Amino acid sequence: MSVECSGELFFYPPFTTMSKELISVHNPNPEPVIFKVKTTAPKHYCVRPNSGKIEPKSTVNVQVLLQAMKEEPAPDFKCRDKFLIQSMAIGDADTSNVENYHEFWTEMEKQGRSIFDRKIRCVYSTKQPPQSADKQVENTSTSNPPVSVEGSENLASSVGGPTAVGVSLDEAQNDFNGAKDHLSNGVNTVVPDSTFRSTFESAQIPDASVVQTVVTDADNGAASVKDTIVTAESASSKGADVARSKVQDIIDNEIPKPSESPRRSVSSTPPVHPPPPVPQNLSAVNEEFDTKKNDFDSKLPESTPAVEKVSENLGSETRESLQGAKPAAGAHSSDNALEQIKPSYSADPSSSTGASLTESPGIPPNIVIILCLIFFLIGYLFF
């Protein structure tokens, strides 16, 4: 119960665009079969239909779409992609309500029916398809409706080629070329002129007035459609203007405006601070400074002996005062001298509240006065 199909599927350039090829699956068996298609590269191919039913002695065309590649493959590239067509005989099973043949396949497989496989190898060809010219003629002819030619039977009988009444343009052209060759070779059977005349007169060409009428009707329809579009655009623009004016009125009337506070004027010129006063006569200041300096230098030698004399007197008086503080007799011990220097406190406990510290003898007042005078003179003369 296997199906019949070609063992190779050829794809032709260009591969940067989507390629479409057909697989003809034929059922030579006396009973119907179901099939499904599998591939080793599901991301590269799209199969329509990928499952279905084939009646006895019938053929189903399976469309295979190859996704576009980023660049053309190398000339020596070998494609390893494959397709697998599985078939299964279903006998008298009812498939009138079957929508998904994959589920129906699963049900039949559970019944233990035999499965037959047919493998198809993909081939990327570097040459153009051999029937590309035929396909181009076919695409050109299918764009125009078939023309019914009267007297084609007579033409066919005269040249020995069977032709249908509703012959297409390409078949009529082939028959005409065959008749021409046949006549040029000296065949005695000559087609009468009336036959050719009736043949070409049957292809009625529409009158120019009819064509003009059709063109006029088309122009009128286009003009009416254009007027409708213009009317709709004008209506929409008017509606937009009305809505815009209403929104502006709401903004002007209902939204409160912020209170405007007076702004202080800010001067653009920066403030100018007056420079410090500069003495007008610098020479007078310099002369005054030089005069004071000369006076100080002249007084300094005169005051130096007096300062030395005062310092000598101060030193002698200081030594005498320190010597007078010592005991007259040298026989006193250091302990007695320390006891004299230490402060004495009253021994009477009753007078402890009124007791006072007895101070040791210090620097005499006259020495303090002399020291103050010396420091005053030094500060006056040198500072």
Swiss-Prot record:
InterPro entries: Ig-like_fold, MSP_dom, PapD-like_sf, VAP. It is found in: Endoplasmic reticulum membrane. The modification Phosphoserine is found at S236, S237, S259, S261, S268. Residues 127-160, 233-359 are annotated as: Disordered. Residues 1-123 form the MSP domain. GO terms for molecular function: endoplasmic reticulum-autophagosome adaptor activity; endoplasmic reticulum-plasma membrane adaptor activity; phosphatidylinositol binding; phosphatidylserine binding; protein-membrane adaptor activity. The chain crosses the membrane at residues 363-383. Keywords: Endoplasmic reticulum, Membrane, Phosphoprotein, Transmembrane, Transmembrane helix. It is a single-pass type IV membrane protein. GO terms for cellular component: cortical endoplasmic reticulum; cortical endoplasmic reticulum membrane; endoplasmic reticulum; endoplasmic reticulum membrane; endoplasmic reticulum-plasma membrane contact site; plasma membrane. Residues 127-146, 347-359 have a biased composition (Polar residues). Residues 1-362 are cytoplasmic. Vesicle-associated membrane protein-associated protein (VAP) implicated in maintaining the cortical endoplasmic reticulum (ER)-plasma membrane (PM) attachment. ER-PM contacts function to modulate the distribution of contractile ring components to ensure robust ring assembly. ER-PM contacts function also in controlling exocytosis and maintenance of cell polarity regulating cell shape. VAPs play an important role in regulating eisosome assembly. VAPs also contribute to ER-phagy by tethering atg8 to the ER membrane, but also by maintaining the ER-plasma membrane contact. This is Vesicle-associated membrane protein-associated protein scs2. It comes from Schizosaccharomyces pombe (strain 972 / ATCC 24843).
